[in-house]
């Protein structure tokens, strides 16, 4: 079997195509969530804290030198990325939970209780009576 034919079979399988669509949609979803966090969620939080723009929060590690900018530790961007992650994680968890609830087999009603048979003593007494005959 040629490599090209094997690759074609691999690429055309349903799982690979589903995964490709998922990656594309995931990339677009990530951009939407990033915009939601940086443009909608963080500005009001910054305003409530006292007019802080989280994008600008940073600690200067080394001052600027000739021809080089100052070295900055931008923890504000890190905080925004944490919010991005939390929103994406909650969304993915919710979708997986919804899909799993749809995949569960419907619960089967319990079978009606079977009538109890004779007890061991009753069976032994019946055998004894049969042997006496």
From Swiss-Prot:
Keywords in alphabetical order: Cell inner membrane, Cell membrane, Ion channel, Ion transport, Membrane, Transmembrane, Transmembrane helix, Transport
Query: What does the UniProt entry say about where the protein is found?
Result: Cell inner membrane
For whether the record's keyword set contains Ion transport, the answer is yes
- Chief location: membrane
- Spell out where the chain crosses the membrane: 10-30, 76-96
**Topology relative to the membrane, per the entry?**
Multi-pass membrane protein
* MF GO annotations: mechanosensitive monoatomic ion channel activity
Cellular component GO terms, alphabetically? plasma membrane
What is known about what this protein does?
Answer: Channel that opens in response to stretch forces in the membrane lipid bilayer. May participate in the regulation of osmotic pressure changes within the cell.
Q: Can you tell me which family this protein belongs to?
A: Belongs to the MscL family.
- NCBIfam families reported in the protein's UniProt record: mscL, PRK00567.1-4
According to the record's subunit comment, the protein's assembly and interactions are: Homopentamer.
- The protein's name in its UniProt record: Large-conductance mechanosensitive channel
Q: Where does this protein come from, organism-wise?
A: Haemophilus ducreyi (strain 35000HP / ATCC 700724)
Q: What is the lineage of its organism?
A: Bacteria, Pseudomonadati, Pseudomonadota, Gammaproteobacteria, Pasteurellales
Per UniProt, what is the name of the gene that codes for the protein in this document? Answer: mscL
């Amino acid at each position: 079997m040629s490599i090209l034919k094997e690759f074609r079979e691999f690429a055309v399988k349903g799982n690979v195509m589903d995964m490709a669509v998922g990656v594309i949609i995931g990339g677009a979803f990530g951009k939407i969530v990033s915009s939601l966090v940086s443009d909608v969620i963080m500005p009001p939080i910054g305003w409530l804290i006292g007019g802080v723009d989280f994008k600008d929060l940073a600690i200067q590690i080394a001052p600027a030198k000739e021809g080089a900018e100052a070295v900055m530790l931008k923890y504000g961007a890190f905080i925004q990325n944490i919010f991005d992650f939390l929103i994406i994680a909650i969304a993915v968890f919710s979708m997986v939970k919804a899909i799993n609830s749809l995949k569960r087999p419907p619960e089967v009603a319990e079978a009606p209780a079977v009538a109890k048979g004779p007890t061991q003593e009753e069976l032994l007494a019946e055998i004894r009576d049969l042997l006496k005959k």
